[in-house]
């Protein structure tokens, strides 16, 4: 016992020293600015910090590639499908078409005997349509429904402790005695809905799969995740490949679709190689039920800075698994399609909310670095502090008073994006990933200031994405973007003022003209390809009915 405690202390000290040393090393490399390659007049340079970031991308891609090879090798792994599985669907003001597609995909799941529990966040007449769709798709004679006036934590009007306990027991009994059940309950947020499903199921099943009501599941999605959990008893949770259902509806949803592929098949695949996936996504994930019930109460009652947390449910659920020392994995063999915002403002609000949960959970996650591979510490430091270095770099370049610095920054952003997207195109075998380089502009212009705003308002939970039936427009997300553009505009004005004081040399004029032409040609080429792709694929997808997720 004492030996284990001593080893634990050593691991805590070791991972802490590693993380601090890594951060100090990166900071020193950035401040010193040592250059390996440098041309006259600083038209081009490649330094120590740039080399470190390039190495990170290469190493991350390598381990992602190795993890995908492991996934392919497990293709023929035979397993016994004798474990019990329950699918929990969280629903809130869902678009009727998306909900119907979700439930139709649930009916096509190939895992035998899977139990379906859908909990609707809201019990008013306006929410009844979701229960009607559930009964229609799942079969009125094969499913049960229940309208609960309260939930596990809030009593209904005029309800006593005893009647509340009886209604809670009734919900539990309905869930345990029916293969398919839909219950409506008093509004309480997604975490309340998930808690109801987990609590009602109790320990009656081996594995619990989670799903959102805007998600279309591939028929084999449950089977593939069960395979991962069955192969290693120390894997506590597994997530699948989440793709975009409405990717051709707007430029935002299209760029999100290529970003999703990178996030899951490069970043999370790399994390999976080391058994430390940071977030098992809500649309497609599965957990060992025995673990869930070790922390479900703590998960529900999570507080941050004195307030109960109302977002980041999936990320904290993953963190709770990691806190017990269990691994979390990703499998590209389990797939689903999900809806993503098609309006810029709704996307921006969604990203801000996700950034809040990321930074909050980063702090929680840091307490368990010592229980996992050093890669978990390494990646947390890199991804957690990268936005701050990037902001410092952008401001520095824009306020140096040299127009070439601004142009070089724009060219570098696109070049790095093009290199990453080219590798992704090779790995995926689809040229569409080249558009990932366009996402870098969206990241620099919108997501970067949104991250800073998320930190500044990390304890505010009053806004985010709304239900899909009624879209609520929230303009607060434009505040950080407006501030960011004002800062950049100030740099541009300062640069024009400085450069106007002295004429350009002939060599400088040539470099600026060539750089501008390259940048313009790049945009013309990619935008032309985008228009062609949308015209070709977007029309084909409209009105198409999908029997399988993989058809999309």
UniProtKB/Swiss-Prot annotation:
UniProt keyword annotations, A-Z: Cell membrane, Endoplasmic reticulum, Glycoprotein, Glycosyltransferase, Golgi apparatus, Isopeptide bond, Lysosome, Membrane, Phosphoprotein, Transferase, Transmembrane, Transmembrane helix, Ubl conjugation
Record-level Gene Ontology MF annotations: hyaluronan synthase activity
Extracellular compartment segments: 33-45, 396-402, 451-475, 532-552
EC number: 2.4.1.212
Residues linked to a glycan: 221
Reactions mediated catalytically: [hyaluronan](n) + UDP-N-acetyl-alpha-D-glucosamine = N-acetyl-beta-D-glucosaminyl-(1->4)-[hyaluronan](n) + UDP + H(+); N-acetyl-beta-D-glucosaminyl-(1->4)-[hyaluronan](n) + UDP-alpha-D-glucuronate = [hyaluronan](n+1) + UDP + H(+)
Cytoplasmic-side segments: 1-11, 67-374, 424-429, 497-510
Predominant place of localization: membrane
Covalent link Glycyl lysine isopeptide (Lys-Gly) (interchain with G-Cter in ubiquitin), residues: 190
GO biological process terms, semicolon-separated: atrioventricular canal development; endocardial cushion to mesenchymal transition; extracellular matrix assembly; hyaluronan biosynthetic process; polysaccharide biosynthetic process; positive regulation of urine volume; renal water absorption; vasculogenesis
Disulfide bonds: none
GO cellular component, one term: endoplasmic reticulum membrane
Domain of life: Eukaryota
Membrane topology value: Multi-pass membrane protein
Ranges that cross the membrane: 12-32, 46-66, 375-395, 403-423, 430-450, 476-496, 511-531
PTM-bearing positions, type Phosphothreonine: 110, 328
Protein localization: Cell membrane; Endoplasmic reticulum membrane; Vesicle; Golgi apparatus membrane
Cofactor(s) essential for the protein: Mg(2+)
Annotated pathway: Glycan biosynthesis; hyaluronan biosynthesis
Tissue/organ expression: Expressed in corneal endothelial cells.
Enzyme class, broadest EC rank: transferase
One family name in Pfam for this protein: Glyco_tranf_2_3
Subunit structure, as described in the record: Homodimer; dimerization promotes enzymatic activity. Forms heterodimer with HAS3. Forms heterodimer with HAS1.
Role description: Catalyzes the addition of GlcNAc or GlcUA monosaccharides to the nascent hyaluronan polymer. Therefore, it is essential to hyaluronan synthesis a major component of most extracellular matrices that has a structural role in tissues architectures and regulates cell adhesion, migration and differentiation. This is one of three isoenzymes responsible for cellular hyaluronan synthesis and it is particularly responsible for the synthesis of high molecular mass hyaluronan.
Family to which this protein belongs: Belongs to the NodC/HAS family.
Official protein name in the record: Hyaluronan synthase 2
Annotated organism of origin: Bos taurus
């Amino acid at each position: 016992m004492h030996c284990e405690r001593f080893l634990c202390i050593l691991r805590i000290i070791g991972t802490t020293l590693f993380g601090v040393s890594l951060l100090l090393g990166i900071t020193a490399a950035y401040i010193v600015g040592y250059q390996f390659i440098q041309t006259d007049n600083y038209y081009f340079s490649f330094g120590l910090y740039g080399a470190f970031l390039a190495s990170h991308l290469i190493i991350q891609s390598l381990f992602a590639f190795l993890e995908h090879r492991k996934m392919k090798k497990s293709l023929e792994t035979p397993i016994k499908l004798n474990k019990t599985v329950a699918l929990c669907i969280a629903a809130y003001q869902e678009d009727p078409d998306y909900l119907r597609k979700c439930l139709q995909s649930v009916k096509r799941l190939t895992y035998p005997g899977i139990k379906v529990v859908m909990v609707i966040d809201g019990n008013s007449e306006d929410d009844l349509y979701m229960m009607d769709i559930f009964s229609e798709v799942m079969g009125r004679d094969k499913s049960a429904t229940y309208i609960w006036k309260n939930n596990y934590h809030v009593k209904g009007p005029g309800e006593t402790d005893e009647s509340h306990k009886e209604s809670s027991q009734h919900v539990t009994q309905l869930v345990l005695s029916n293969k398919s059940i839909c219950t409506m309950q008093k509004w309480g947020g997604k975490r309340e809905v998930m808690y109801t499903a987990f609590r009602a199921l109790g320990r009656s099943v081996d594995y619990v799969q989670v799903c959102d009501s805007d998600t279309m599941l591939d028929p084999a999605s449950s089977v593939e995740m069960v395979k991962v959990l069955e192969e290693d008893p120390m894997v506590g949770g597994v997530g699948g490949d989440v793709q975009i259902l409405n990717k051709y509806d707007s430029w935002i949803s299209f760029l999100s679709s290529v970003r999703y592929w990178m996030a899951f098949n490069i970043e999370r695949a790399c994390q999976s190689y080391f058994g430390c996936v940071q977030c098992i996504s809500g649309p497609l994930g599965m957990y060992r039920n025995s673990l869930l019930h070790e922390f479900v109460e703590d998960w529900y009652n999570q507080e941050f800075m004195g307030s109960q947390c109302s977002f980041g449910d999936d990320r904290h659920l993953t963190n709770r698994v990691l806190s017990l020392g269990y691994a979390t994995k990703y499998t590209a063999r389990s797939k689903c399609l999900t809806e993503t915002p098609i309006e810029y403002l709704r996307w921006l609000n969604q990203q801000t909310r996700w950034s809040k949960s990321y930074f909050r959970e980063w702090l929680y996650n840091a307490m368990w670095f010592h229980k996992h591979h050093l890669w978990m510490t390494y990646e947390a430091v890199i991804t957690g502090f990268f936005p701050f270095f990037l902001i410092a770099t952008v401001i520095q370049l824009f306020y140096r008073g040299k127009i070439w610095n601004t142009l070089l920054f724009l060219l570098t952003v696109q070049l790095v994006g093009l290199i990453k997207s080219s590798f992704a195109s090779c790995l995926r075998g689809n040229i569409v990933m080249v558009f990932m380089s366009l996402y870098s502009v969206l990241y620099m212009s919108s997501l970067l200031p949104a991250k800073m705003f998320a930190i500044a308002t990390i304890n505010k939970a009053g806004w985010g994405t709304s239900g899909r039936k009624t879209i609520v427009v929230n303009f607060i997300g434009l505040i950080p973007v407006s501030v960011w553009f004002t800062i950049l505009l100030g740099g541009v004005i300062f640069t024009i003022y400085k450069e106007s004081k002295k004429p350009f040399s002939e060599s400088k004029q040539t470099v600026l003209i060539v750089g501008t032409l390259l940048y313009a040609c790049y945009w013309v080429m990619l935008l032309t390809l985008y228009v062609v792709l949308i015209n070709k694929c977007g029309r084909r997808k409209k009105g198409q009915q999908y029997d399988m997720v993989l058809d999309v």
